[in-house]
Amino acid sequence: MGRKGAKAMRFLLSLAVLAALAWSGYWALAARGIERGLAGWLDARRAEGWAADAGRISVTGFPARFDTRLAPLDLADPATGLAWSLPWFGFSAHSHRPQRVTVRWPEAQRIATPTERIEVTAEAMTGALAFRPGLALELVSAQLSVGAFGLVSDAGWRASMDGAEIETAALVDRPGAQRLRLSASGMRPPEKLVATLDPAGLLPPVFQQVAIEAVAVFDAPWDRHAVEDRRPQLRQVEIGRLDAQWGDLALQAAGRFDVDAEGQPSGSLTLRATNWREMIALARGSGRLSAPLADRLEEALGLLAGLSGRPGMLDVPLRLALGQVWLGPVPLGPAPNLRLR
């Protein structure tokens, strides 16, 4: 190698050293910024009256990643009475793409409400989040997956499922709108709820599956202010597909409804029910429908199903109005309140 070649090699080596030093400085500053930012966020929550404590905040992963861990983490919001305790909470991002974050939860967590404490077990619970660049951390998309999941309450109930996946994505052409997809399998609701819905014990204790595709429109973006200040509230929901299977009962739904400031929905849904007579029997047995009303509904719906040529399958238009769910002029029961706390 000649002198020119040696000089070129020394120059390239110097550039590599300078680049490595610059990258090391960037990583160290960014890691320190993450630690200070999290500590500042916890201080701000405490100033607002929260209980917000992280035993230790650490950032590792040099040079390619920022792997952040808070251990343990305890949060409690006095405005809602909700509290969340974890032995650790972790998230990570590539150094060159910090707005895309992978989140990890421990297998054991605890949630407390004003009335009960719930022990949570979650197998392989992970998420992937994408944020718009900026301090607001506005959510662009999210994916959450979990394996076996269980809830045990000190109020005496327990529930579980075999697994679930949730996806959301902001719609660029519709401010505040999020496309939602959810699928869950092997759901075991609390025994008391199953006994209320099915007092005769005709159905299995496990819901085989639920799948939902919908668009939800909120009055504010999902960003850090959704945790610090107020939850974005639903203003409109479009259900493209809802499929649920419980034993021999199958339910499909689609429709659209608005949500007012009090969380009351108004709009319409179309339900397709397979083995719908068993559903009426469940509503009658649980007390949701009185015997005379159940008889009238079964007679009227039987006529509709017969006209369709499929007596075991029924398409039913429902209205949501005045805080009730209606089948024509008949109120079936209260509509759910959709206000987010």
Where are these regions (language model features)?
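Short extracytoplasmic/periplasmic juxtamembrane "stem" segments immediately C-terminal to an N-terminal membrane anchor
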Residues: 38-56
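Extended terminal
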Residues: 9-13, 55-58, 227-232, 236, ...
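Flexible, membrane-facing loop/turn or short amphipathic-helix motifs
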Residues: 74-83, 109-120, 148-159, 170, ...
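Extended lipid/amphipathic-ligand handling interfaces
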Residues: 57-59, 86-96, 120-136, 153, ...
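N-terminal type II signal-anchor transmembrane helix
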Residues: 5-39
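N-terminal beta-strand/beta-hairpin edge segment
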Residues: 50-173, 242
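Beta-strand-enriched cores of mature, soluble protein domains
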Residues: 165, 180-184
